[in-house]
Amino acid sequence: MKCIKHPRIKLLLLFFLFSSLKMLAQNGTVTGIVKDAAGNALSDASVVVQAGKLGTRTNADGKFSLSLPAGVYTLIASFTGKSLAQKQITLAAGEAVSMDFSLADAGDLEGILVIGSRTPRRVSTETAVPVDVLNISELAIVAPQNNLNQLLNYVAPSFTSNTQTVADGTDHIDPAQLRGLGPDQVLVLLNGKRRHSSSLVNVNGTPGRGSVGTDLNAIPAFAIERIEVLRDGAAAQYGSDAIAGVINVVMKKSTNKLSASLYGGGNASTGANDHRGGMDGKQVQLDLNYGLGVGKGGFINFTGSLTSREDTRRATDFNGNLFNVYNAIENRALTGGVNLSSLFSNVNNTPNTAQIISTIKQYAPGVSYLTAAQQTNIQNATTISTLQGILNANVTKDELAFRGLERRNFNMRIGQSKLQSGQIFVNAELPISINHRFYLFGGYGIRDGNSAGFYRRPNQNRTLTEIYPNGFLPEIGSKITDASASVGVRGKILNGWNYDLSNTYGQNQFKYTVENTSNATQGINSARSFNAGKLGFMQNTVNLDLSHEYDVLAGLNLAFGGEVRLENYKITEGDQNSYERYDINGAAATPSTPATQLPTDFFGLARPAGAQVFPGFRPANALNKNRTSGAGYVDVELNPTKAWLLNAAVRYENYSDFGNTFNYKFATRVKLMTGLNFRAAIATGFRAPSLQQKYFNSTSTQFTGGVPFEVGTFSNESKPANLLGIPKLKQEDSDSYSAGFTYRVPKTSLTFTVDGYFVKIKNRIVLTGSFARPGGTPAGDLLTLQQLFDQAGATSATFFTNAINTESRGIDFIITNTFKYSDFSLKTDLAGTVSKTQKVGSIQASDILKNTGNLNNYFSEASRIYLESAVPRSKLALINTLTVKKLEFFLRHTYFGSVYDPNTADVNGNGLVEGATVNGQFIAVEHPIYGSRTITDFSVGYEISKAFRLTMGANNIFDIYPDRNLKTQTAANPLVGGGYGTPGTIDLSNNNQFEYSRNVSQFGFNGRFIFARLSVTL
């Protein structure tokens, strides 16, 4: 070790040492322990000086030490889920004082917030914008729900999320919305750090269509202490996506405690098992959480979660045609050892015509229920075309009886998907020194899902009856892997500056496997399962945040920082047989392959390419795209007086792919009287188009009115988009305004809050309606477009585009109260929201789209409904929690407002689907309305001992279902040029299969769910 030789440096060090000792001599010290009402030490509780900048946190043993100059102080102790406690102290120079705090359970969560304010010790009632604090660790014990999306759906009225059905990948990741805006217009944070989004784009007919959200269910609820929901625009503080607000998930920090939960339940409903009653949708979940104390105030907290969930089935029996005469004869031939369909690949181009005709005549008599006339006609036929007319007759009833089948054997799987998942998460903070801490948190999860598409019936050209004589139900298997890790260091530097330097990595992969299916163009050689490719999204974010509190006026907090983010999006192609169209020789077909060389069914209909239900991603779909962004912000909070708070924030952000944006926010809170606050905010915001929206492209099978269509989603930068005049994507911009009041009745726990808001969004990104493939023999650009459709195997196409402007407005209110007497306590929460979102102004489209009359394809009437009316405009939750000694009763009523179906029908029964002139065209605008419902949840918990607790109850205890779908009807639809056409069939139930709408639902349609949960704490 080298000695210090320079005398000036020695003098300087002695000066600093002397100054430090002098300062310590002038200070006093306050030490103590913070405990809960039961006497348990609270780790990481906050102890701060009221209206000051000094404070500390407790260590793993609940102990704290705070050095203060001589004076009179009010110290406030707080911990999430506990009431604040404050004590006054007079401290002399050099004095050491001991002061302990005991924190009772809070009626509302008043703990120190991570979001909404960059002042380190701001509580929810002090913020200038509305922030809800939800005690998820408590809800996860008493509530019937066991995943994060559903927990929030029933406790936070401004939040909406439901499981989807028959919607491809969206069956496996539930879209979530805040304040009726899109799933991608709410920012999700984990411990205050930006969470990565899902790799999945919602392209099917569900709320949130065209959006990319964050998979909240990738975070186990058992790992969560609380959730903070900022219900206000916050892009100036947090960056892209925070238009509707911010959801911050705060992980558990507990130490020296093992917690476990064993959960089981199922849907005991009259609608279970395709409306035959009993129970389905059985679930089992095991959760474990354990924390270790490390050093002085450090901790490592682990959570593991395993889930197994069966599917639910809510289909009704298909009432359409299943079998034709050809299916019956083919069946008799197979019984006789002859594969009739193997005699041809293309029925119009086969050397086996005579043998086919002969075989049909040979086995036709085995179909005993055919009439004599039918048998005679078959025996007299001399050509395939003649037989096609005869053998296409419907014989479903008789053939079902012959095969010993019922119509329910052909039911779809309509309901929640199957699920197997495993997750492990960690949250750690380790002291480096008195002023510096290292932290690490994140997790890894695997989720295997299985859902089903539309049943492929024997009489369809999509079905290889030589493989599946009775048709088949194709399945979509998903393997979702989600990984995240945040590492950083934070503390104090440079005379009181708080700093936080971190790196956050996250990735999400969605791998498709198509099962119990076939590629119809391969015939008998087709595989039964396919690797259909995968999607991948990666995000890496580096943040540096600095803040300092100053004794200016009644308090000033200055914060600034920067962010650098890298994003990557990948589409990986599937195996060739998952997407390819093969010719009759087994070679890959091309757009120039003659029709005579393409496989057909017996009736001459071309076999569709690729794996049924989800054709795999093609090499042309595969891509690997990156972008970077950088941002800087300044955030200032000033208290001119103790009763007045001002907040201002500005943020500049630059993206490598579309340029820069500048946003600001101003907010204020005024204490009007004891307990009564007024708050208001004005802000601009933005959302960058996601890489998924810019580059996603694929071909999928979508059903409209029970008819399958191969719909291609072309990227915004593709040639088809250019030929149709689809503009390049740019960011969404927003202006938001909010104002409200909070009131806490003095000397009580009764609290009222009400907030109104108004949000304008410009250049909102949507997924267009379908553009049909050009028919005939076009020339020029139309010919090019036709060829591009054919290369993608698509009959229609959709695109992502900035099409519209919207306005959203609403009112949120919350009332909370806790009444306690002896061993009795009653906590009551009433929360509600009323909101409205609507398109405003004209559709933003190119002249090409306007001149070709394509505006109503560009932004369709169905898209308008998904935007404005597919989620409830009103929602109300009344929650009562009654505790009597060792018993706890949980009762919740949740009101869901009405929603509109994006499909149109003759709702009023006048024989017409009412129309209106939109963009110069007369289109259908009459939509089914599904009325409001109130869902009741109830549970009873009993504390067997300090270590064991048993909770039993039900979600939707009265087994409530949404309104049923309209049945098949005959009505006239509007004609584009005006008037109404010839009456035709309208069937929203797809031949009676969908008892409830598959497109919208306020609360799902699984009915009553009963559960039991054993909680263990050691």
Regions found by a protein language model. Name each.
Residues 756-761, 768-905:
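Gram-negative outer-membrane beta-barrel transporters
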Residues 97-101, 148-151, 176, 215-217, ...:
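N-terminal periplasmic accessory domains that precede
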Residues 53-63:
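Short, acidic Ser/Thr/Gly-rich low-complexity loop/linker segments typical of extracellular
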Residues 466-468, 472-487, 492-494, 505, ...:
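Outer-membrane beta-barrel transmembrane domain signature of Gram-negative proteins
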Residues 198, 760-762, 836-839, 894-913, ...:
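C-terminal beta-signal and adjacent terminal beta-strands/loops
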Residues 65, 193-231:
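Short acidic/polar hinge/loop motifs at secondary-structure boundaries
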Residues 149-199:
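Extracytoplasmic beta-strand/coil segments of soluble accessory domains associated
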Residues 35-37, 45-50, 78-82, 92, ...:
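Short, acidic, small-residue-rich periplasmic hinge/interaction motif at the N-terminus
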